[in-house]
Amino acid sequence: MEEENPILRSPAIPDWVLFTDESIVVVNKPAGLRSVSDGYDPSLPHLRSVLEPVLGRLWMVHRLDKETSGLIVLARDADSHRELNRQFREREPIKHYLAQVAPQPQWNEITLEAPLKVNADRAHRTRVDFEYGKPARTDFLVLRREDSWAEVDCTLHSGVTHQIRAHLYHLGLGILGDPLYQPPQFKAAQKSEVERMMLHASELTFTHPKTGALMHFQA
């Protein structure tokens, strides 16, 4: 049995740090915490500002929206950062998200391959744009259905900003708690008790940058 990493037993480490070794840190980022420093107010908390006082210097590899919770891997040295950047640039990691959406999808499974343009309107939303958009593909699978909403597994095959939210919007769906991407039929279907955007990065699979081992995390 593998011995528990003593670093994770430190009371100074947030309980949402799931794994760390000499090369990487894997976290289950809480909703509301920024992945990177805010461009207007750098003093606002973000992943590195919270973790670096305890774990030392960290390198960002990828990010989640502030409102999105879930799995992120960070590098602990420049070589690991370089290798993880290569993996993400070449779309090698497998990323699954869980989204609670409304209204009910008219399908159980669908793949949307539609190019996306970032900052496409005055609200700075990402929109499907077949002329100027970047290639983007998302697989959607309905996992369960409730009265007015459904839980959907979303698998990314590209990495455009707001990709899941924009692709769902193009399909006439919105994520519960998302104030930015709301199709006309969406508001009446929202759960009244939702206080955050119901999008969570639930699975992450990648290759360890030093050992070559396959790393798989669920949260």
Spell out what each predicted region is.
Residues 1-219:
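RNA pseudouridine synthases
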